[in-house]
Each structure stands twice: as C-alpha cells, then as structure tokens.
C-alpha cells in the first residue's frame, strides 16, 4: 500500500463493479466481486457455491475472531475483505457511491487508503448496508458460502 498506482488499481474495483451492474449483461439480480489473485492467502475450496442472502445488503467478510461463548472478540483486524463482496443490483450502486465519496475525501487529505480498512469504516458508518460474517482471510470463501451467524 505504499505504491499510489496500486492503491488506485485496488480501489478501481468498485467502479468496475458499478459498471457491471449498470450494464447488467446477464440480467441478474446479484453481483459479486472476487479477486482471483487472493489465492495466495484465501483457500479456494472445490465445488463451492456462493449464494446471496435473502435480503439485499452487501455480504462481506469482517476480518476478526469472535468467541461466541464469551461474546467477545479475540482480535479485531477492523477490516472487511474487499476481495470478495456479494450484493444486490440495487445495493451495489449505493456501496460504490459511498466508497467513491470516502476514497476521494481521504485522498484529498493525503492519506494512504487501504480498501479493506475503508470498507470497515463504511460498515461502522452504514451498518444497514452490510451483512457481515466474522472470519479470517484464509476462510473468506468458505465462510461466505455458509449462512451467516453474526450480523450487523
């Protein structure tokens, strides 16, 4: 994240996702962004199916560990895995609009922008937009393939 071109390229995914929703070439209700380069850290199980939730919120992975018995975090990375997002065609434009505004504001202040941390800040400011699941980076796909147990 010390390379300005890398920061711009990573954050450009949201505009590409927005363009996909606008064109809706396959006439679908839900869209997903998946970074295939994430395989260096994310486990890609065979025959795994990602499905959207019943509601229209953005389905995302909150990078943290949660102890259900103690109802406390073992650690909280305060990041959303931006490499895998699933959302409804009506919700994605809201996500991308908020991302654009937040990204441009931080950029104008001269900040180095980590998209995973920016998404977490967006989650804190707009919890109604997200349906998040607590997990580690390695298990993102497996976790988002199962019904969610911790939500906002």
Place the predicted regions along the sequence by residue.
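Conserved donor-nucleotide/metal-binding helix-loop-beta segment in metal-dependent transferases, i.e.
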Residues: 23-26, 30, 38-71
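Short amphipathic alpha-helical segments and helix-helix/interface helices
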Residues: 17, 48-50, 119-120
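A structural preference for long, well-packed, hydrophobic secondary-structure segments
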Residues: 18-27, 61-81, 86, 92-94
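Active-site-proximal specificity loops/subdomain of glycosyltransferases
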Residues: 1-25
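Catalytic core and acceptor-binding pocket of nucleotide-sugar-dependent glycosyltransferases
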Residues: 38-40, 74-152
């Amino acid at each position: 994240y010390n390379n300005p071109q890398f920061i711009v390229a990573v954050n450009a995914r949201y505009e590409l996702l927005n363009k996909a929703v606008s064109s809706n070439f396959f006439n679908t209700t839900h869209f997903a962004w998946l970074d295939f380069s994430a395989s260096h850290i994310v486990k890609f199980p065979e025959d795994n199916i990602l499905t959207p939730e019943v509601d229209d919120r953005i389905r995302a992975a909150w990078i943290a560990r949660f102890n259900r018995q103690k109802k406390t975090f073992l650690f909280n990375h305060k990041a959303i895995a931006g490499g895998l997002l699933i959302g409804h065609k009506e919700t994605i434009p809201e996500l991308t609009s908020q991302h654009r505004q937040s990204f441009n504001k931080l950029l104008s202040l001269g900040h180095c922008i980590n998209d995973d941390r920016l998404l977490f800040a967006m989650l804190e400011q707009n919890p109604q937009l997200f349906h998040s699941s607590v997990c580690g980076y390695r298990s993102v796909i497996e976790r988002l393939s199962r019904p969610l147990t911790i939500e906002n």
